[in-house]
Every structure is written in C-alpha cells, then in structure tokens.
Amino acid sequence: MYVGSVQRFIPARMKFFLKPYYRRLFSERLHVLFWPTFRCNYACTYCTVCTKFDFAKVFPKASEKRVEQWLVALEKLPPAMIYISGGEPFLYAKLPELVNNLPKKHRLLGIVSNVSLPASVYRKIERPFHLNASFHREFVSAESFIARIRELQEFLHVHVNIVATRENLPVIASIDELMGTHRISLHVDPYVDHEFSYSAEEESMLRKYTQADRRSLVDFNDFNPKQCSAGRNYINLLPDGQVFTCAAGFSYTYSPLYAELVRNKPVDNFRMGNLFDDDFALNSSDIVCKLPCKDACDRDSVLITIQPAEESLQTT
C-alpha cells in the first residue's frame, strides 16, 4: 500500500506525534529530500530559499536535470522514501511525469506546494500522494486558499502548513478556526532565521498551536558536537544532482545569510558528490556535526545523539 494512501487514515495530530518514533523504528530506511527546482512564483519576504537568498541563482533552470536523467539516476539509490520540496516544485514542468515513473522500489512520502497552479496540474499525478499545502498570506487570501484546498481534497490527501512569522502569529488562532470549519488540518512551523527570535510572549502563543513534531525551537548558538545519521539514511538531492547530507548543509555551503555563522568552520563534509557520478555512494557511518541543526525537515529525518566527537566518525 502506498504511503500516500495510508496517510488518509491517520489523524493529523497522531501523524505528527508518531513522526520521531517512526524514524527510530525504521532507522535504516533511506529518506530523500528532493529539490527538482528552486524556482518559485512567490517571493515571500521571510523566505530564506527564494527571497532573502535566491537559490535559483545558484541552481538556475538550465542546471535542472531532465526527467529521463532523473529516472536513471534514482535507480542507483536503495529503496527510499522521497519527499519533494522547492521552490515551487510544480514549476518543474514535468514533475507529474517524473513522479508517475519513479522506480517502483521508491515510495513518495509527499510533495509541498503553494497550490497556486491549476488543479489540473495536480491531477496529472496518477499515484496516491500526500500534498503539504503551504499557506502564504502575502500572496493569497484565506478564502481563496481554502477554496483551492477544498477543490484539491476531492482527489488528494491534503494538509495545510503555515509558518509562524511575526506577522502570521497573531492571526493563527483565527486561521486555525476557519480551517477547522472546513475540516482542514493546519500545521504550524516556527519561523527559523538566525537573525530572528521570538519574545517570551510570542513563544507562549506559539506553543498553543505547534504540535509534537515542532515543539523545540532552533538554538543558533548550539555548536555542541552531534552524532547525526544524515548522509547515511537521509540525503538532500539538488536540481543538478548534487547531494548533501542535509538542507542545513547546502544552506551553510551556498547561502551568504549564514556566512558569519559558519566562518572558520568546516562545511565540506556536508557535500556527498553528485548522484550522476559513477562513484557516488551513501555514507557508511554517522557524521559528527558541530553546527546548529536549523531545518525541521532535517530533524524529521535523521537520528541525532548529543555526544563528544569520536575519532572513528566523520566530523563536520
């Protein structure tokens, strides 16, 4: 049974509660966070991927691999759970074709989208999948967004996600209530930016709406060594085939937003080569990372142990 089908029968809160336990239970299963494009049709002021720094300038459309190339390269990987992110992934025009023809050994965990494209685009995907619909209030009203979600729910399993920016936080209660009247599940992500921190009052407000998988906030002063399974059972696959251990890893490598944070700190060990290289291989052991684990998508997918670095492990 496809994961997308199973998710239909799991209540949202239960799913988020079980997420870390699932990872421990299936500790060896490979998870792939796949970024087919960093292009986006929105420019949210708070976005560290498309606006505050635009990764599409590092990975322009011309660098993106073709569907037929991806289908061959993905055969190299062991059976994996694949989650597709971006940018707006559906700006990669042949994404439905790619998803429909994924090697049978892989499972599609979900796709994130701002759901701004016509419903007909999403209908092109023939296999069951979970759609994580991102609500961006700078570009769409709640009423218009809900209308689109209800349209997509006719044939898809959909959850809605919103980022608790300082502008969004005061209205999350009303948004949650409005979504609830339409039987739409709302998931709240804390806003993560190394130049931003919540006040004590804001943290208290945030705790009312974050679920079990998002209770902890990122400490950008955390330079303690962490034994991490990224690179062994979790990778990030970028538009040109580059592979990084984690999303934080390619952010620390490419984004000037974090230049001061990582100054004089090694970041080379986040790189794993390119999936299209003949000698590409997953890491055979955990790494020890001393940089902040800033991305929730990374923490969802790895096993982390706080401990002193050991000589036998690769160190970042």
Task: Please provide the spans of the model-predicted regions.
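Radical SAM/AdoMet-radical enzyme domain recognition
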Residues: 67-84, 92-178, 185
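Short cysteine clusters
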Residues: 40, 44-47, 228, 241, ...
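Radical SAM enzyme [4Fe-4S]-AdoMet core and its adjacent flexible, acidic
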Residues: 130-260, 270
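Short secondary-structure boundary/capping segments
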Residues: 24, 123, 225-227, 281
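Glycine-centered flexibility sites
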Residues: 86-87, 115, 231, 241, ...
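Flexible mid-to-C-terminal extensions adjoining Fe-S/redox cofactors in radical SAM and related proteins
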Residues: 14-30, 50, 247-316
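Conserved alpha-helical substructure of the radical SAM core
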Residues: 2-111, 118-121
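Processing junctions and N-termini across compartments
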Residues: 34, 38-41, 222, 283, ...
